[in-house]
């Protein structure tokens, strides 16, 4: 009897993180999917305050977070509780079976000093060449970020700014921080700032060190729930080569002109659920990536991705595939999502050396208003227009071509877009696409589809203002 009681206590000491029932999202799907496994977190609790943390907005908490994670790790895992306050920090590296829990009014602010965001190479003893994502995990199992608090990426200390994307007042405010202008004087770089040191020898080299806010690599059983993510230096969250990922009920917000300010990017992951999120981003809203070229093929596809009940306000695209997806896209369901004020709604973008093949993509019941450009767009010559980029003029080897196929859209409702459907590509790049039972109200043109693009429209109604 005693042994049975001990066994029961051990079982109950592990709690499935915020054990919400997600089964309703897996009913009546057009493809078979496995519901992601939630992380199992031991019922141990450590407060950041117990480990020297201080939420006064002045104290650096990097060591306190590391100490708390180490303490929980020795206990087999548990919940790292962050109470109300402002916690300045550098890197937070999660370990197995740990939940980073932000209580209401808890704000984690990433340090303005870029040096706080680099790991030291254990072999050379020198700083790594690129900053590490502020909250990171690699090859971990059962990890989560939960709660009602906020993570502020302090992105303006990292991101370059294009003059064309800010007002006169904003431009003066950036220059008041110090910084450096490019030769043309139309791009501001956060290099040679008044109050923070450089981390590279010039502005271009420093720009290459910029990285994401949250990145999980090769992890299993991941949950991000409830928190608010603000103003990342680059992408806000990007699980990469992960399995069993749930992103539920988070808010992502950054300036509309934030360079590379993607909200949620999923890269070569399997069994993913993205639900109930609210996004207002500087770049893509919910984006699927699968690597470029041979590296993308090795990483594998995005597979079994379920995206429902999300709202996207500003973004370059509400739902996006690409630009790099050489590993492929397989079994993706996007339904019951709203896009209001995005540049494009459903965006499929890629190019030579970045492309792959899509399979079993189903998009249903999408509601869009005030779309700046095309409601639905296919681009196969996409140019990654990062700051200072120049289009390549030399011939490119014709490999890893985009193959957008087997994409099925239905019940797409659009009130306000410049172009309804736009598709450009050579023969074989955009084909076997169906759009059914949809209404599109446009202001410029209903369709702009190349003859080589094979898109079947069934019961699609286009309307515009009377002329």
Q: Where in the sequence are the language-model features?
A:
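Extracellular beta-rich repeat passengers
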Residues: 325, 336, 345-467
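Right-handed parallel beta-helix
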Residues: 104-105, 141-149, 220-230, 243-255, ...
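Active-site-proximal loop/turn and secondary-structure-junction residues that shape catalytic pockets
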Residues: 86, 241-243, 251, 270, ...
């Amino acid at each position: 009897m005693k042994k049975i009681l001990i066994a029961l206590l051990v079982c109950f000491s592990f709690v499935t993180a915020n054990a919400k029932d997600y089964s309703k999202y897996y009913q009546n799907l057009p493809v078979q999917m496995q519901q992601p496994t939630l992380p199992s977190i031991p019922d141990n609790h450590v407060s950041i305050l117990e480990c020297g943390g201080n939420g006064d907005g002045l104290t650096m908490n990097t060591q306190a977070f590391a100490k708390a994670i180490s303490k929980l790790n020795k206990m087999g895992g548990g919940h790292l509780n962050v109470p109300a306050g402002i916690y300045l920090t550098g890197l937070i590296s999660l370990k197995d079976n740990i939940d980073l829990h932000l209580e209401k009014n808890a704000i984690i602010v990433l340090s303005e000093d870029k040096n706080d965001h680099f790991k030291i190479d254990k072999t050379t003893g020198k700083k790594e060449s690129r900053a590490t994502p502020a909250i990171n995990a690699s090859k971990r199992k059962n990890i989560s970020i939960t709660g009602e608090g906020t993570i502020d990426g302090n992105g303006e200390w990292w991101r370059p700014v294009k003059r064309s994307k800010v007002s006169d007042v904003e431009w003066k405010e950036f220059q008041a921080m110090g910084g450096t202008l490019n030769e043309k004087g139309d791009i501001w770089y956060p290099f040679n700032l008044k109050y923070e040191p450089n981390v590279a020898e010039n502005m271009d080299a420093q720009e290459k060190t910029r990285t994401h806010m949250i990145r999980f690599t090769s992890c299993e059983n991941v949950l991000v729930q409830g928190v608010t993510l603000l103003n990342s230096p680059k992408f806000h969250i990007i699980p990469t080569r992960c399995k069993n990922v749930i992103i539920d009920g988070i808010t992502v917000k950054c300036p509309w002109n934030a360079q590379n300010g993607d909200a949620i990017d999923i890269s070569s992951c399997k069994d993913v659920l993205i639900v109930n999120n609210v996004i207002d981003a500087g770049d893509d809203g919910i984006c699927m990536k699968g690597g470029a070229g041979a590296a993308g093929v090795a990483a594998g596809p995005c597979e079994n991705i379920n995206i429902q009940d999300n709202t996207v306000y500003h973004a370059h695209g509400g739902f996006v595939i690409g630009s790099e997806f050489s590993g492929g896209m397989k079994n993706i369901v996007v339904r019951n999502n709203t896009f209001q004020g995005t540049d494009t709604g459903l965006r499929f973008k890629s190019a030579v050396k970045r492309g792959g093949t899509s399979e079993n993509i189903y998009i249903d019941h999408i509601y869009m208003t005030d779309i700046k450009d095309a409601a639905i767009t296919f681009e196969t010559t996409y140019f990654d227009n990062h700051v200072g980029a120049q289009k390549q003029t030399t011939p490119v080897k014709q490999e890893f071509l985009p193959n957008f196929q087997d994409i099925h859209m239905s019940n797409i409702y659009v009130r306000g877009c410049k172009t309804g459907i736009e598709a450009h590509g050579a023969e074989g790049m955009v084909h076997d696409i169906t759009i059914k039972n949809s209404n599109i109200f446009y202001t410029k043109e209903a369709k702009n589809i190349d003859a080589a693009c094979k898109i079947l429209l069934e019961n699609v109604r286009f309307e515009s203002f009377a002329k």
